[in-house]
Amino acid sequence: MTKKYDLHCHSTASDGVLTPTELVQRAHEQGVNVLALCDHDTVMGIDEAKIEANKLGIELINGVEISTNWEGRGIHIVRLNFDKTHPKMTALLAEQKSLREKRAVEIGHKLEKAGVPNAYEGAKALANGEVTRAHYARYLVQIGKVSNDGQAFKRYLGGGKSCFVKAEWVDIPTAIDTIHAAGGVAVIAHPMRYNMTGKWIRRLIVDFKQWGGDGMEVADSGQTKDQRQYLARLANEYDLAASLGSDFHFPCGWIELGKNLFLPEEVKPIWTLFE
């Protein structure tokens, strides 16, 4: 039987809406055999997810999505199959947590000035872990300032808007070195979602490969066939393994755990590096 993989999804440990237990249950309902919980800059949900995965016969891979800075842009690096208790890993995640908290507080202050009372407290009440922009968006919907999350980003939280705070994250080489020290593999998350031209995507991949990166996401739930083939060609051209993941955050019509996730035959699957 061919295994069904989803190596990128989120829970309430970061900005997802399902608990780790609920997420694993939904993955099981969707026929997923191998799952990686990749919350933003935290591994706090993995132990809970693993308990449910063991009950349901799902193989759970340790994962985390690390926020990094590259050429003035925010780039996400997915870490897979690592020792989450490794000292270098725990130190980096502690640093990221501090940076994320600092940013969250600054966003709260800006929202207060923009006429949103108790913004930080309201967002924190919706968060199970670190406060993210997604939690602020949900709070803005809750109090009636906007009608949906997208409007919250367009009006307040998106890049260049009045309450946007630029993040200060680690650089990519530091992220990769920490991943390797903990025995894992480093993967560029969703390369097509950074609003970059093909030239800039190649520059990112070249730097990532030069710094020791292992793979890139080639398949996700919402892409076109042409996008998948394009990313597969880049993975082969730069000798990177190919990963796949829905980047599931909440139930919706267009993104689902395990949905439309398969790799073109010509690529090297990332799980071949797990042994």
Regions found by a protein language model. Give the residues of each.
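An N-terminally biased module of ancient metal coordination in phosphate/nucleic-acid-related enzymes
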Residues: 1-73, 156-158, 171-253, 262, ...
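Extended substrate/RNA-proximal surfaces in nucleic-acid metabolism proteins
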Residues: 54-206, 261, 265-269, 274
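A short acidic, helix-capping loop that chelates divalent metal ions and anchors anionic groups
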Residues: 88, 253-254
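Short clusters of hydrophobic/aromatic residues that line enzyme substrate/ligand-binding pockets
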Residues: 257
